[in-house]
C-alpha cells in the first residue's frame, strides 16, 4: 500500500489535494491489499492506516466501519447516517447547502459501504455501492475492481462478464487502445512495480513484498472556509 501511496502523491496532486488526494491513496491501498487478503473487513480497515487519523476523511471512513458493526444487517441505516453527517460539503459548489456532494470522502464511504455489506458477493457489492448514489458509476467500479482483485478475473460472475467480453477488443473513441490493450499495459506496469519495490517475478507467478501501511501527511481541504450565501449569476447581473 505504501508504494501505491507514493504514486497517488504524484498523480493525485495534479488536480486534487486533501480529501481528493486521500481518496486515491485509500482506494489504491485497498487494491494493493486485495492481492494478499480475502478478508474484506481487513482490507477496508488496514487500508485506512494510510490516511492521517486527524483528517475528516479518516473520520468519515471510520464512521462507516463503526456503523456497519452497529447495523450489520441494514446498509440503508448506515447510508442514512452518512447522509446526516457527510452529505453537504463546502468544497462542492453545486452542492453547497443541498444534499449533493461529489467530495471524495462520501464517495469513498459508498465504496466501503458496498464492500462491507456486500461481504464478498459481487452482485450485492455492486448493487449497494450503486444505489448509494452520488458518483454512482465510479463508486461501484472501484468496489467491483477491489473485489475483482480479491476474487480473481475468472471468479467474476458470468452475469457481469456478458457485456464486458463483447467490449474488450473495441478501441476507445479517439484512441488506438482497447480494454485488452490496457490490460496488457497495466499488467506490464504491475510487474515492473513489483520488481521495483522488492518483489520477484517468475515465469507464471510473482512474490509480493508485504508492507505495513503508514499514513501519508496531513492535508486538509478548505480549512476555515464556509460559504455565507449561494448565488447564481447570469448576463443581467454583469455590468458591461
Language model: regions and residue ranges:
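Flexible glycine-/small-residue-enriched beta->alpha junction loops
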Residues: 1
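Short, conserved phosphate-binding/catalytic loop or strand-edge motifs used
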Residues: 4-11, 25, 164-165
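Accessory "access/gating" subregions that flank catalytic or transport cores
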Residues: 9-15, 28-133
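Catalytic phosphate/nucleotide-handling subdomain of diverse soluble enzymes
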Residues: 15-19, 26-27, 106, 110-193
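Flexible, glycine/charged-enriched surface loops at secondary-structure junctions
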Residues: 18-22, 38-43, 57-61, 139-140, ...
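Acidic, carboxylate-rich catalytic segments that either coordinate divalent cations
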Residues: 54, 58-101, 150-240
Amino acid at each position: 500500500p505504501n508504494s501505491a501511496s507514493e504514486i497517488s502523491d504524484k498523480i493525485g496532486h495534479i488536480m486534487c489535494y486533501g480529501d481528493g488526494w486521500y481518496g486515491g491513496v485509500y482506494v489504491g491501498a485497498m487494491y494493493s491489499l486485495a492481492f494478499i487478503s480475502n478478508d474484506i473487513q481487513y482490507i477496508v480497515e488496514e487500508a485506512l492506516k494510510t490516511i492521517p487519523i486527524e483528517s475528516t476523511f479518516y473520520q468519515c471512513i471510520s464512521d462507516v466501519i463503526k456503523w456497519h458493526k452497529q447495523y450489520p444487517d441494514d446498509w440503508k441505516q448506515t447510508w442514512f447516517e452518512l447522509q446526516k453527517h457527510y452529505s453537504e460539503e463546502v468544497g462542492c459548489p453545486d452542492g453547497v447547502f443541498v444534499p449533493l456532494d461529489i467530495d471524495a470522502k462520501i464517495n469513498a464511504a459508498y465504496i466501503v459501504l458496498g464492500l462491507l455489506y456486500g461481504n464478498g458477493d459481487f452482485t450485492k457489492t455492486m448493487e449497494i455501492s450503486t444505489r448509494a448514489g452520488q458518483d454512482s458509476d465510479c463508486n461501484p467500479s472501484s468496489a467491483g475492481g477491489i473485489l475483482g482483485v480479491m476474487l480473481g478475473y475468472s471468479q467474476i460472475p458470468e452475469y457481469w462478464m456478458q457485456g464486458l467480453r463483447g467490449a474488450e477488443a473495441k478501441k476507445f473513441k479517439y484512441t488506438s487502445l482497447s480494454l485488452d490493450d490496457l490490460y496488457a499495459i497495466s499488467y506490464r506496469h504491475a510487474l515492473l512495480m513489483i520488481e521495483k519495490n522488492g518483489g520477484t517475478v517468475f515465469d507464471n507467478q510473482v512474490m509480493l513484498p508485504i508492507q505495513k501501511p503508514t499514513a501519508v501527511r496531513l492535508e486538509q481541504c478548505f480549512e476555515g472556509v464556509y460559504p455565507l450565501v449561494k448565488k447564481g449569476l447570469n448576463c443581467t447581473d454583469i455590468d458591461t
